[in-house]
């Protein structure tokens, strides 16, 4: 209760349970009540509370954000698997940090998906608070059950239910670019970062000097105008042939060419080569992600650097990693 706060007013919460009913968290300041369902606090405000926990709807940008959350909830319930390869992937996305960095730190996973990164952050010794807006929290709860100190919370990234200055480290990997106003959501997260703490983000890149990747992205963007309007189940079926094509044209050629010294330099330029070290279903999962998420924003290195600079952060670093990894430190 020291960390969790009311998302409406940042007031302190206290548990309340009447005989025979579920536990609820009640705000001492404004009186808002939030259910705890299957050990997950559901700290949602309207319209997401009604839409995700009841039978309500949302409109405008809220509707876009809701559909995005439901799309990813569908995705992670279809692809709940945890792979050993995620451990290497976790550290790749956390560069320049190593596993030792996480020991003893209080960490926020802002957009936890199926919980794969929260799992490894906890395994490396962190106390992790993992939030997501949609039904993916159920998968994350199961996947992190044996990881250590992980608390999954269902909440809106625009209104995180935490006390200010709560976390030593905040990361948001592959999430912000799916929001209606990504930079505003990013800046909002800084309120919950301790002075001197670090924030780490991963954003899709906008290819500038890579003609093959730029051409592929043009095709994907054109296809998304259709696929984002399709039912989730249809996109799930389409993700399989899309992954097969990726393996035929890029992954398998990379595996062969990278073993031939004379062709290795060409192999390293192939798109989608990262799937060569993952099971096929990971590629299918990512194709579903690519074609079904309603909102997708992409950025250049300079744009990511500008985000971090406008936020008044120090020690700014931006590195390429199948996109852009941005890391910076809050003053203090």
Features from the language model and the residues they span:
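GHKL-family ATP-binding catalytic core of two-component histidine kinases
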Residues: 161-163, 180
